[in-house]
UniProtKB/Swiss-Prot annotation:
Name the record gives this protein: Alkanesulfonate monooxygenase
Top-level taxon of the source organism: Bacteria
Reactions performed catalytically: an alkanesulfonate + FMNH2 + O2 = an aldehyde + FMN + sulfite + H2O + 2 H(+)
Enzyme class: oxidoreductase
Lineage of the species this protein comes from: Bacteria, Pseudomonadati, Pseudomonadota, Gammaproteobacteria, Pseudomonadales
One function term, GO molecular function aspect: alkanesulfonate monooxygenase activity
PANTHER family: ALKANESULFONATE MONOOXYGENASE (PTHR42847), ALKANESULFONATE MONOOXYGENASE-RELATED (PTHR42847:SF4)
A single GO BP: alkanesulfonate catabolic process
Its EC number(s): 1.14.14.5
Keywords: Flavoprotein, FMN, Monooxygenase, Oxidoreductase
Species of origin: Pseudomonas syringae pv. syringae (strain B728a)
Function: Catalyzes the desulfonation of aliphatic sulfonates.
HAMAP family: Alkanesulf_monooxygen
Assigned protein family: Belongs to the SsuD family.
Amino acid sequence: MNVFWFLPTHGDGHYLGTTKGARPVTLNYLKQVAQAADDLGYYGVLIPTGRSCEDSWVIASALVPLTERLRYLVAIRPGIISPTVSARMAATLDRLSGGRLLINVVTGGDPDENRGDGSFLDHSERYEVTDEFLKIWRRVLQGEAVDFEGKHLRVQNAKALYPPIQQPYPPLYFGGSSDAAHDLAADQVDVYLTWGEPPAAVAQKLADVRERAARKGRTVKFGIRLHVIVRETSEEAWKAASTLIEHISDDTIAAAQKSFSRFDSEGQRRMAALHDGRRDNLEIAPNLWAGVGLVRGGAGTALVGNPEEVAARIKEYADLGIESFIFSGYPHLEEAYRFAELVFPLLPEPYASLAGRGITNLTGPFGEMIANDLPPQAK
């Protein structure tokens, strides 16, 4: 099991949909989140992409030298950048990070943003471009001098002279819910990602990708993207979920859902269908809450509950074949600690052992000393 955290390069705060309790995106704050995730033992962090975010490659480049073990899941955008240039960027960052780069392949689901970035392709064409892009990208990073002519992309003598540390190339992660996305995942990527739908729906998606990959003689690993709201009691967790959206007006929800409706992303459509823009009845499966998606695009569901409930839901997804869990919580600095402290002890190794760092001992007490000479009591 690999547990990731998330870098909030599009903003952070205590609530959704309001400036109340909000935090600006600064390098110092992102450094705090990244270093906390590194110190706590998270496998890596996802850096989002899009016009509402700071650039993921610049952010990763700034944070890599400030962390020791943390991996960075960074987006590439087929159709926006040359596959050869992208491959060389990946090789460089992989070398500079000591092999800590992971690649998130993003086709882009917002036609308005895509046109602003210079891409006027429709949904099916974007997947055609992504397929051609990855064929070039993968070969370049394996040391080939590539000649390629496809429907959309053409290169001659494309090459990267400096190889990545990870061989044959940094692992490719990719998410999508359409048939075209499942075909692409089965054919070219290492880890297929899904947003946090109910377990039965996730099981269907994984089975479909698994079957398509088997027909091509391949195996694909699986991951899931979820928010998390965990507290010591279930009542506290659900209260925190309610508090997170208490400042969102109905007009704001309507405006957000109208914006999402222009997307041609099947995944976004499925996320929106979980709540239909309504704030009532947001628990769509046991401990799975769709409130985040009322105003946030992309991943819109959260695991909500006490540590045992959250761990049980994680195990439920793991039993389906999920190996990588990409979590986030508001605010991201505090919640990185809270999730590690409350849930890591209930997860498989190495996370259970990482949580054991909090055991008090006389040579290195954790927690504030009592009076002037008494260590805190172990729990």
